[in-house]
Amino acid sequence: MKKRMLVIAAAVAATSMMMASPVMAEDFKVGICNYVDDASLNQIVDNIQSRLEEIGKEKGITFDVSYDNCNADASVMEQIISDFQADNVDLMVGVATPVAMRMQSATEGSDTPVVFSAVSDPVGSGLVDSLDAPGANITGTSDYLDTSSIMKLIQAQNPDVKKIGLLYDVGQDSSTTAIQEAKDYLDEQGIEYVERTGTTTDEVQLAADALIADGVDAVFTPTDNTIMTAELSIYEKFIDAGIPHYTGADSFALNGAFVGYCVDYANLGQKTADMIADILVDNADPAKTAVETFDNGTATVNTETCKELGLDFDTVKKAFEPLCTQVNEITTAESFDEVDAK
């Protein structure tokens, strides 16, 4: 279990009046658990922390943040949440659906609010009654994926596409809705599809090999953390086979996939921090605080992969632009710290 303790503090500016009658800054304990070590989720956590620091300075308060990453291990996740409870945190933050669901269960009947981040289907996963009115002591931010838009990107780049591979982890709640939406869309379009799944990196590698053998023209993966973790080990397989991999997060493109189409995860992290502050500082009721959703529309193209697939980036960009709010470029790396999207 990787554990990191961060104290985000802001000092209240001193005036002669305050020196005569000191004003004590409020202190809030926040426990953040990340589901897995991947670039998009790490970007969310980084932006939650930096935004809380800004809010602390603005309001003259202190956020004591405990951060852990369970690396998709359920027993480790359980221990992290138990530690947060033992530490009497004022609020828990669950990054990704599995963590949010466990936090919801662990805090049921208590006064500890939960804020989730990067949950693709908050209603379908049972976290909230509705996006507008969560109904319990939980709310958060969603990275809902507009699956049909990714399908349209595939068709824009290759109007003659005949068969699409669907690569995902059946155990990832974040993939369930998106995969069904992809099937429905492809059925309507009369495009053949084949499903391959994996729950570990080794299984994902075998699934990628199977899709290549299946002769697919392109591969689609939603915001699936299992596949994201394995991307660095499979992207070259798809390049060698001449198969573009379209995905539901820019971190996939960072790790070698052809395209990542998604929300702005940095902004999502900042908005999650705003929600944390609203609940702790301004006493907002999570049950009545609407889940915040974001416009999809940013396509991030890995220019190195694009070139190796024999595609011209300018041509791809021209095909994508009518379907996107923006088209970004990126090159292959392990983390966003190593490379800046253009």
Model-inferred region functions:
Residues 19-25:
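Sec/Tat signal peptide C-region and signal peptidase I cleavage site
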Residues 278-342:
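Hinge/cleft segment of the Venus flytrap/periplasmic-binding protein
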